[in-house]
Curated annotation (Swiss-Prot):
Reported function: NDH shuttles electrons from NAD(P)H:plastoquinone, via FMN and iron-sulfur (Fe-S) centers, to quinones in the photosynthetic chain and possibly in a chloroplast respiratory chain. The immediate electron acceptor for the enzyme in this species is believed to be plastoquinone. Couples the redox reaction to proton translocation, and thus conserves the redox energy in a proton gradient.
Keywords: Chloroplast, Membrane, NAD, NADP, Plastid, Plastoquinone, Quinone, Thylakoid, Translocase, Transmembrane, Transmembrane helix, Transport
GO CC terms, sorted: chloroplast thylakoid membrane
Location in the cell: Plastid, Chloroplast thylakoid membrane
GO MF terms, alphabetically ordered: NADH dehydrogenase (ubiquinone) activity; quinone binding
Summary of subunit composition and partner proteins: NDH is composed of at least 16 different subunits, 5 of which are encoded in the nucleus.
Major localisation: plastid
Transmembrane spans: 10-30, 33-53, 61-81, 92-112, 152-172
InterPro entries, per the entry: NAD(P)H-Q_Oxidoreduct_6, NADH_UbQ/plastoQ_OxRdtase_su6, Nuo/plastoQ_OxRdtase_6_NuoJ
Protein name as catalogued: NAD(P)H-quinone oxidoreductase subunit 6, chloroplastic
Species classification: Eukaryota, Viridiplantae, Streptophyta, Embryophyta, Tracheophyta
Membrane topology label: Multi-pass membrane protein
Family listed: Belongs to the complex I subunit 6 family.
E.C. numbers: 7.1.1.-
Amino acid sequence: MDLPGPIHDFLLVFLGSGLIVGGLGVVLLPNPIFSAFSLGFVLVCISLLYILANSHFVAAAQLLIYVGAINVLIIFAVMFMNDSEYFTDFNLWTVGDGITSLVCTTLLFSLISTILDTSWYGVIWTTRLNQILEQDLISNSQQIGSHLSTDFFLPFELISIILLVALIGAISVARQ
């Protein structure tokens, strides 16, 4: 969006704080329904951040796919679960939980150190140069397709593997 600087900065800080509060709500709220609604709030804030970044197609896809389908599916799944078996085991801390938290913390700190050590100056100029060159050549959807099949092929495939693992995990949990 073409907003004046202070308004853009205010909206950015407001949506960022909404993301933080919503993310804490997802993790810390004991009721799974409230956590699912908090996740919906986080996904709407992410969509609004995409609108601020002039990525209207990605914002619409975020709203339709994640908020409209995935979050509603999560809410329905939580509402139909037998809640008595899930609320009794919340206070147990197992070895798997400790290992999982250790791995996640290690990944978080390695990601933060990688982000801080990377020189982003050349990346920003390359992105702007590509945007200027591709602005007149093809439409936005064609640009997204060409970037997914060339520049972002590896992250796209990694996301598909993560989704496959999540699907297998959901099926194994549902079978138990």
